[in-house]
Amino acid sequence: MSLYSQYMDEIETRKNDLGLSPKPIDDAELLSEIIAQIKDAGNQHRKDSLKFFTYNTLPGTTSAAGVKAQFLKEIILRQASVEEISTTFAFELLSHMKGGPSVSVLLDLALSDDETIAKPAAEVLKTQVFLYEADTQRLEAAFKADNANAKDILASYARADFFTKLPEIDEKIDVVTYIAGEGDISTDLLSPGNQAHSRSDRELHGQCMMTPEAQQEIAD
């Protein structure tokens, strides 16, 4: 049985037993299989595969994120062609991946000699804040080599454009929900530490904010 078939079975189980949406993809091998189906214009699973690739691949530092970033790079460099993913949309998808391999790919593109690719990649990098030391070292080396895009990116970081150019928010925001998590709380996800094993599966993890008994009490 293929990994994709196993994933389809898992989707049905989650839906029927738990009432959950498909689990976000974090496995490189599964996503590679999905990409192969996207490339196959006649594949019966192509439409769903495109949705899983675009909207249901876990970002950050997962192995799947690495595969996704590389495929988007191929599209931008015109080494691969997907009708539904333009160069502009590929850059947009990279911008939402929040660090990890996507930053490495963006640096590859921003520091390239092709300005039609380097410039938009640099603009995306200006919005990214999850850079490793290896990433900043690449920018430093390019800056010292008089790379114009590297200078532009670093100047943007120095101005904190990634923060100051965020959309304005209301002066006053009414509190509509109060959450009291149990035990050690993660500040980025505001969730109980004793349920950390399920954090990558956000929808499943969200159920741990309240005991099943308490959820049923509210439902009743």
Q: For each of these PLM feature ranges, what is it?
A:
Residues 42, 83, 113-115, 147:
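Short inter-helical turns and helix N-cap capping residues of alpha-solenoid HEAT/ARM repeat scaffolds
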Residues 28-35, 59-78, 99-111, 130-142:
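Amphipathic alpha-helical scaffolding segments comprising HEAT/armadillo-like alpha-solenoid repeats
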Residues 8, 31, 69, 183-187, ...:
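Alpha-helix initiation and N-capping motif
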Residues 18-23, 47-63, 77, 84-99, ...:
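Structural detector for internal amphipathic alpha-helices that build alpha-solenoid repeat scaffolds
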Residues 2-40:
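Amphipathic alpha-helical packing elements
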Residues 4, 31, 46, 68-69, ...:
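Short amphipathic alpha-helical segments that mediate assembly, nucleic-acid/protein binding
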